[in-house]
Swiss-Prot record:
Residues 3-237 form the ABC transporter domain. The keyword NADP does not apply. It is a peripheral membrane protein. Its main location: membrane. SMART domains: AAA. ATP binds at G35, P36, S37, G38, S39, G40, K41, T42. GO terms for cellular component: ATP-binding cassette (ABC) transporter complex. It is found in: Cell inner membrane. It is an enzyme of class 7 (translocase). This is Sulfate/thiosulfate import ATP-binding protein CysA. Keywords: ATP-binding, Cell inner membrane, Cell membrane, Membrane, Nucleotide-binding, Sulfate transport, Translocase, Transport. It catalyses: sulfate(out) + ATP + H2O = sulfate(in) + ADP + phosphate + H(+); thiosulfate(out) + ATP + H2O = thiosulfate(in) + ADP + phosphate + H(+). It comes from the Bacteria.
C-alpha cells in the first residue's frame, strides 16, 4: 500500500509545525522519519495514522484520498514507544484485542482469533508467554507484543513512533534486526519515527531527514550519508569537524595557514569548512595537503584504527576528532604533534554549498 503526501501543512495554534510536506512512499518500503525533537516527524506520523488532522494538503493511500477518513477506517497499525499494552490483559488477550472489537460483520470467530493470535505469537517468538501479563515481561518482550497486536488486524500500513526508544542499547540492536527480517518476510509498508541515526541507517530502505517542519532530504541511507543535500543534513548525520576559514583568491586560509584551491572561486571571504574525522589526513610534517598543526589530547585504539581527539595549535579554539588508520604512522600517544588536512572538505557560505571548489592536490 503506497502513501502519497501532497503539500501537507499543520498548525498548533499559530505555530506552523509542518511546512507544505510532499512525500511519496512506495508500497512495501520501510521509511524512517529522522530528525531532532521539534522537527515535525511525529506530527507527520500521527497525520498518516489519522490521530491528527492536517490544516492543508492531501493524504492518499494507493491513490485514494484518506484525508478525512477516521483513524479506525484507515487500516493502519500503530506501535507506540511505551507499548500502550493493557495491564489487566494477558499477552494473548492484548494481541487479540483489535480482532475482538472489529465490527460484527468483520470479526473472526473465536477459533479463528485463537489461530491468528497463535501464529502471531510464534512469529514474534513469544508463544511460551501467552498467559503472562505485561508486568511480567521485559521491555523487548513488551514491544514485540505491541507489534504483534498492531499486525493482528492485517493493517495496510504499519506506523511506529520511536519503537525502541525506551529500550537499552543491546535490546534495541536485537529488535532492529528482528524488525527488518520481519519486514522482509511480510513486505508491509512501514513508516517509523526515530532520532537515532544508527537505527534509521540500519533498518530503513529510505530515510527522510526533517528539520523545523521541513524535509531536508530523502534518500537511501547511503545517499543521505555520502551526499548530504543541505548543511543541516551534513551537520546532523554523524560526527563532523567544522572549521572557520576565509577564501582569498585561490587560497583557503585557516588562521595563518592555508590550502591551495583548484581554482579561484566566485565566492571570496568567510566560509565554514566541514570534514568528517575519517576524511582527515595526518602527517608528521607540514605540507600543502596537511598544513594545520595539532597536538594529541586523547587516543582511543579501535582495532584497525585510532580515534584521536586533537587540539589545534593557534588556528582553532575547540578540539577536533581525527580517525587515523593503522599503519599510516607510528602508534600515536598523548602529547604527539602532527599536521592535519583533508581533500574532501565541503565549503559553505552560510547555508550555501560552494561548488565547484576542491582543495588542490598540491600547490
Amino acid at each position: 500500500m503506497s502513501i502519497e503526501i501532497n503539500n501537507i501543512s499543520k498548525y498548533f495554534g499559530r505555530t506552523k509545525v509542518l511546512n507544505d510536506i510532499t512525500l511519496d512512499i512506495p508500497s512495501g518500503q520501510m521509511v524512517a522519519l529522522l530528525g531532532p525533537s521539534g522537527s515535525g516527524k511525529t506530527t507527520l506520523l500521527r497525520i498518516i495514522a489519522g490521530l491528527e488532522n492536517q490544516n492543508a494538503g492531501r493524504l492518499s493511500f494507493h491513490g485514494t484520498d484518506v484525508s478525512r477518513l477516521h483513524a479506525r477506517d484507515r487500516r493502519v497499525g500503530f506501535v507506540f514507544q511505551h507499548y500502550a499494552l493493557f495491564r489487566h490483559m494477558t499477552v494473548f488477550d492484548n494481541i487479540a484485542f483489535g480482532l475482538t472489537v472489529l465490527p460484527r460483520r468483520e470479526r473472526p470467530n473465536a477459533a479463528a482469533i485463537k489461530q491468528k493470535v497463535g501464529q502471531l505469537l510464534e512469529m514474534v517468538q513469544l508463544g511460551h508467554l501467552a498467559e503472562r501479563f505485561p508486568s511480567q515481561l521485559s521491555g523487548g518482550q513488551k514491544q514485540r507484543v505491541a507489534l504483534a497486536r498492531a499486525l493482528a488486524v492485517e493493517p495496510q500500513i504499519l506506523l511506529l513512533d520511536e519503537p525502541f526508544g525506551a529500550l537499552d542499547a543491546q535490546v534495541r540492536k536485537e529488535l532492529r534486526r528482528w524488525l527488518r527480517q520481519l519486514h522482509e518476510e511480510l513486505k508491509f509498508t512501514s513508516v517509523f519515527v526515530t532520532h537515532d541515526q544508527e537505527e534509521a541507517m540500519e533498518v530503513a530502505d529510505r530515510v527522510v531527514v526533517m528539520s523545523q517542519g521541513n524535509i531536508e532530504q530523502v534518500g537511501t541511507p547511503d545517499e543521505v550519508w555520502r551526499e548530504p543535500a543541505t548543511r543541516f543534513v551534513l551537520e546532523f548525520l554523524g560526527e563532523v569537524n567544522r572549521l572557520s576559514g576565509e577564501i582569498r583568491g585561490s587560497q583557503l586560509f585557516i588562521g595563518a595557514h592555508h590550502w591551495p584551491l583548484d581554482l579561484a572561486p566566485m565566492h571570496q571571504g568567510s566560509v565554514d569548512l566541514f570534514l568528517r574525522p575519517w576524511e582527515m589526513e595526518v602527517s608528521t610534517q607540514s605540507s600543502d595537503r596537511c598544513p594545520l598543526p595539532v597536538q594529541v589530547l586523547e587516543v582511543s585504539p579501535r582495532g584497525h584504527f585510532w580515534q584521536l581527539t586533537v587540539q589545534p595549535i593557534g588556528w582553532h579554539q575547540d578540539p577536533i576528532s581525527v580517525v587515523l588508520p593503522e599503519g599510516n604512522i607510528d602508534a600515536p600517544v598523548r602529547g604527539n604533534r602532527y599536521y592535519v588536512g583533508g581533500l574532501n572538505a565541503r565549503l559553505y557560505s552560510g547555508n550555501q554549498l560552494l561548488q565547484p571548489i576542491a582543495l588542490a592536490q598540491s600547490a
